Amino acid sequence: MSAALRLTNLTVSYDRHPAVHHLTAEIPAAEMTAIVGPNGAGKSTLLKALLGLAPHIEGRIECTARRIAYLPQQAEIDRSFPISVFDTVLLGRWSRFGGFGAAKPVDLHDAKHAIEAVGLSGFERRPIDTLSVGQFQRVLFARVLLQDADLVLLDEPFAAIDSKTVADLMVLIQRWRAEQRTVVVVLHDLDQVRRDFPSALLLARELVDAGPTARVLSADNLLRARAMAEAWDEHADACEVPVRLSA
């Protein structure tokens, strides 16, 4: 299987403290890959590094995608900005018409279709600050739909979301895979990862394992990830962190 992303000796630091440390791994193309690991393992930082949004990046990132769509955690989005559902979704075409250009009829048509696809017909003129968490996540997925990207990066897309919305959004993710798009998702729910994601990358600032989900999420690997994360907490400035596994 070809790789959509190749990471070689990738290190990402904040104030000289490594959040991702000497990571070498591949993300398969046209596949659904979950990035998992303990809290503070560098999962969200890794997504930002792939976009060039993280400071102090060392190593090599090779990406075959022509277009990349990114969905951050909702906590990072200011919902107080006075904007409608329709205009929020239309921002998915921002790179095509820019700040001073006008959306074309095809963009308006596609935005309407994307809103229908996420089950929000009739919400087009609603201000985003009047939506529930689940409704707003549907809006953000509609915006991703409009970007028509080869590589889709989603950071905790199901946090605090109702089960019906999770199921509906998973249908979209599976559709992207069927369309040969690469989807990389940061998740905490390991049961969902085992059920829905064929590929996984287990991170504890350093790579624990990457590959088929059943192998990556073995009991031994999860124990090792926890031990590595605890060791990093004790040795935040160290380049080589001792890891002691319980017998």
Task: Place the predicted regions along the sequence by residue.
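Helix-to-loop junction immediately C-terminal to a conserved catalytic motif
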Residues: 51
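Conserved ABC ATPase signature
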Residues: 127-131
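Catalytic Walker B motif of ABC-type/P-loop ATPase nucleotide-binding domains
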Residues: 152-156
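H-loop/switch region of ABC-family ATPase nucleotide-binding domains
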Residues: 187-188
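H-loop (His-switch) and adjacent beta-strand-loop-beta switch element
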Residues: 197-213
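ABC ATPase nucleotide-binding domains
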Residues: 214-247
